[in-house]
Amino acid sequence: MKVFYHNDLDGRCAGALVAYFTGNYSPEDYFEVDYVMDLSVVPVADGEIVYFVDYSFKENTLDFLKSLQERGCQICWIDHHTSSINLCNAHPELQSIAGIRDADASGALLTFKYFSPYGDAPDFVKYVSDYDCWKFQYEPQTTFFKLGIETVKYDALDEIWTRLLGEMWTSEIGYLIVTGRTIKGYVDKTNDYYREHFAYESEIAGHKCLVVNQKTNSWVFGSKYGEYPL
């Protein structure tokens, strides 16, 4: 068995779910990948089971997928990116590949649904999907969990996932959320100070905007975010 998973929180969570449901925790079978890596360097045997989770194939990488099909590999492809869905529409022969291609949920949540179609996904999987798809239906827990889990090792086979999937999951997820809440509080206070001292108004194409010269994300705008059209 080989498992290819995307190198972000969603992909790592998806990879962890493959390990949990298949019972295969062999590190030599798991490969964290991005979109510039050459997947063909990974040795895959003819007829082998191959999982791609939270991974988007495109026209220039399609040959690898087709080569696995031709070699009789049992492929499971789970992804939520629009590029994957468009690729399947453009190549009907890909529709027969097992898995789920659906833009309504993240790769991790789709992976859970694939293995447990009638089960209710754990809260942490919902938080991962909520953040990755930018839906934020479970805020503030979504952001707190994301920040909290980034304080520990969270690769696909790291212990954090087995703890989150274990009997003590409530205390584990609670600890991560509390940790994330503390981090977010610090970030917000730091952003407030920086914005209050260094932000200034300007215009872009005639539209009033607030400018903050800092390498950061939109959190730096705080409550000002909704006061400007840009």
Q: Model features per residue range: what roles?
A:
Residues Y138-H197:
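Accessory alpha-helical/coil subdomains and C-terminal extensions
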